[in-house]
Amino acid sequence: MVNLRCPVCAGALENRAGAYLCPKNHSFDIAKSGYVNLLLNSSQGHHGDDKLMVRARRDFLDKGYYDRFIAAVADAAAEFTPPEATVLDAGCGEGIYSLAVLRAIEKAGKHGELLGVDISKTALQYASKRSPDFTLCVASCAHLPVEDGSVDEVLNIFSPFVPEEFARVLKPGGYLLRAYPLREHLWELKALIYDTPRDNPPTPLTTEGFTLVETREVRDIIRLSCNEDILSLFRMTPYYYKTGAKDQQKAEQAQELSVKLAFGLAIYQRD
């Protein structure tokens, strides 16, 4: 069962006819697209990934380029969930990993409920179309609107890593799955754009409050045969927003590109 809490007073939220309500009568309407906004002061400017990044990621991932990694995440998630599981996808984006995880849990003969949290309303609008079985919230990974010790598993797939908050919402002995880029991930994309590309720095894996159970690596080479897919890959990464117009033109002019994918997946258990 997904146990949401009020972002104002931390009281338990109940779904009552199209809105979530806490005992102190703080009320949060459910949008037509199916998510509830639990981000305080969310009217003050744009939050999270913008429409260009979200659409680029959706278009790129829906073409199957990351399927090997998505399957690895889903299989690991299903392996480490109990028979009846509540899974939190912290930074769920447009929901492609969330859906794969739910399907893998069902395939393993288990039952899962999935809560997707993202700070981007645009991303959740797309996520709501993936499956009617998601519970979706606009919220920050740093302030999850989830009751203490109520989640069996947390997914952290290329989103802000906030271990103290993940430890708070996880049950004792629950699992955290964290994705991170390996040294050579997307090297050829960086070499296309930058004169002096750099390796990805190593990711520190020791995390207070958690025991590292194991790490897994997934590698692949994808071949992009049209400019549309090259631009989608570029625009779904932070590189696009850190690159000047002159270097962006290199991606805009490229017609084909082979790119190495190199993912790490760290599996932790809450102490």
Segments and roles (model prediction):
Residues 173-183:
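Conserved beta-strand signature within the Rossmann-like core of class I S-adenosyl-L-methionine
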Residues 163-175:
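A short glycine-rich, Lys/Arg-flanked "PGG" loop and its adjoining helix->strand segment in the class I
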Residues 84-93:
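Conserved class I S-adenosyl-L-methionine
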